[in-house]
Amino acid sequence: MASFSAETNSTDLLSQPWNEPPVILSMVILSLTFLLGLPGNGLVLWVAGLKMQRTVNTIWFLHLTLADLLCCLSLPFSLAHLALQGQWPYGRFLCKLIPSIIVLNMFASVFLLTAISLDRCLVVFKPIWCQNHRNVGMACSICGCIWVVAFVMCIPVFVYREIFTTDNHNRCGYKFGLSSSLDYPDFYGDPLENRSLENIVQPPGEMNDRLDPSSFQTNDHPWTVPTVFQPQTFQRPSADSLPRGSARLTSQNLYSNVFKPADVVSPKIPSGFPIEDHETSPLDNSDAFLSTHLKLFPSASSNSFYESELPQGFQDYYNLGQFTDDDQVPTPLVAITITRLVVGFLLPSVIMIACYSFIVFRMQRGRFAKSQSKTFRVAVVVVAVFLVCWTPYHIFGVLSLLTDPETPLGKTLMSWDHVCIALASANSCFNPFLYALLGKDFRKKARQSIQGILEAAFSEELTRSTHCPSNNVISERNSTTV
């Protein structure tokens, strides 16, 4: 996903995917998010940071606005990335930085919203403690810790994002050793139809398009690997067209692979790759072949085939791709996705829902002033909007780990992945408008200054605890800010 957040390859892009509804919808969402979110968050940051008195609530929402503003600043790069059909013209550093900013926004926002929820809960259930300990300094310290944790959660994105070159264009994606995952994989065509061996995804600087003729030799099996100097086109072979006992060719997910140069391998090994009598019955060159598009498996008639039977150096060819010979998703990709789901969504969501449920229950039982629900209402709606925007992103991320991209469901997930990323980014433009609409009556707010609107939304007003005695002195001590 990343990344913004999410993440096969076609030479001509005949399908013109940027004309498809999901891509158009994504571009519209990203454009509106940038046009509305940048001035909106910038205005809130300027007024709340420079014009308003610093309170605990102001600190919370000030840092939340800063996270949203950083996300909005990265949106032009994401929009251009989508408009260029997955091409990345901004270089390696921004390939790492831009997705990291989007993930940073996600973690910082959800951690800040969780802190706001816990703060609301403490105000209601522990008013005396809040009266003595809840202050601006503590809020700033908590926000600082939140930013540190959010930066730590971005490290995997910054480490694993790399530039790949395909069709003479740079593309940005994840690289896990010999495995890779490009952004916007549905921009690329069928990897086995009308594909030239020149158009192979390669990390720049790591391998050349043309190599000198060479061969791999082992003591057990003589493997001759002539280098292909001219573009070759391979069509998907049928199972019946292959000789009995020959190695069958299975399509590999090119959109998620990093490939070596275009080599045609002519193994002189026993038919079916048997282990016992591997020094007899050499095959001719037509019995089996392997291109860098394809993955090699022994036929049903063969005995067990081990990767160690391959000559040294060719084993790297065998394991290229996002999936290994057991069709397993790379462990780092699984770890990144699950961590985002649990730490960046499920756990904070449970905490926020529990906090606001307890608050609603207590408010229904107690005597709370109408003004007390002001910031509470703003916080609840902000949390709800966050969950709506980010839920599809995490669902699609998990499904992408469990679904074969070549199935109809997998292709649908790839097509709508852009929309999920755009919707998650759109969360960064909603909050300024929520602040303006939820404090007081909208008609009154329309006549107020921006500073007055924000002061109403982030107000720190005294309210009375539900269990305060009638004694005025004790009642005043039990009052706290909301």
UniProtKB/Swiss-Prot annotation:
Post-translational modification (record):
Among the sulfation sites Tyr-174 is essential for binding of C3a anaphylatoxin. O-glycosylated.
Q: Name one GO biological process term.
A: positive regulation of cytosolic calcium ion concentration
Q: Which residues carry this modification: Phosphoserine?
A: 459
Which residue windows are transmembrane per the record? 24-46, 58-80, 97-118, 140-160, 341-360, 378-400, 418-438
Q: Where in the cell is it found?
A: Cell membrane
- Gene from which the chain derives: C3AR1
**So which stretches are on the Extracellular side?**
1-23, 81-96, 161-340, 401-417
**Family assignment from sequence similarity:** Belongs to the G-protein coupled receptor 1 family.
Report what the protein is called.
Answer: C3a anaphylatoxin chemotactic receptor
